Amino acid sequence: MTVAQSASAKPTEDFSRATLVLIGHGSTLNAESSAPTHQHADELKRRNIFGQVVTAFWKEEPAISAVLRSAYQPRVYCVPLFISEGYFTEEVIPRELGFPPGQRVMQKGGQTIHYCGPIGTHDSMTEVLLARAKETVAKHPFPRAPKPSETALFIAGHGTGNNENSRKAIEHQVELIRAKNEYAEVHSAFMEEDPRIADCYKVAKTSNIVMVPFFVSDGLHSFEDIPMMLGEPERLVKSRLAAGQPTWRNPTEKKGKLVWYAPSIGNEPHIPDVILQRVREAAAA
């Protein structure tokens, strides 16, 4: 069952008197960081499901701490567009919204405010990752598009000793995708932990690799760091970036492997359906 099918298979709740708050990280350095949040807000406004849809950011305006002042519907659902549960989703965002520690529902000024789980830990993100992997190969089928059964799929993340949950979110998705038996191999890969992204050439047994970065937005990690970890010279990556070109050419041959590198999953068209599932879960709790 697809994300959209599982969303539509449930009874249609009435959210016409509810506000949806989409919460992104944002960035003072990279204007593109907030683009997926705005994109999904626009799409959900277009669907006309909620009485109001607003956005908020940690590093940009409107600030998370102020966003509830603009919410005017009696029910409010706050969905963090983050990949994993961790410091931001467990502590920073609830605190900025005014939730008491440990609470996920609060009454405030005649409103019932729900704090939903992050999109990245939802099981249906599996479909988002698979869609991204398949469309990347389909767009660049040179010399021919390999079948998933001939391909090693890598889900790439930051990885950090400070937050093991970011690793867990990726490993969970790897297990779910592996269970589908579509790809010859499915592996996790990290920037700052083992197994490293650069080691994908040794790990993959097939001659085709697809690398999907499990980030909400494209930024320095996905545009610069990962292509260089995959073996592109820094000079070439930076010159392509400055020229507005893709920093990785799909596919590129390295170490006897053909490598397709996907954009981040943040703007994938399935994401609004994942957001809706998070809202429905909170409404039913």
Give residue spans per PLM region.
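Active-site-proximal alpha-helix that buttresses catalytic centers in soluble enzyme cores
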Residues: M1-A285
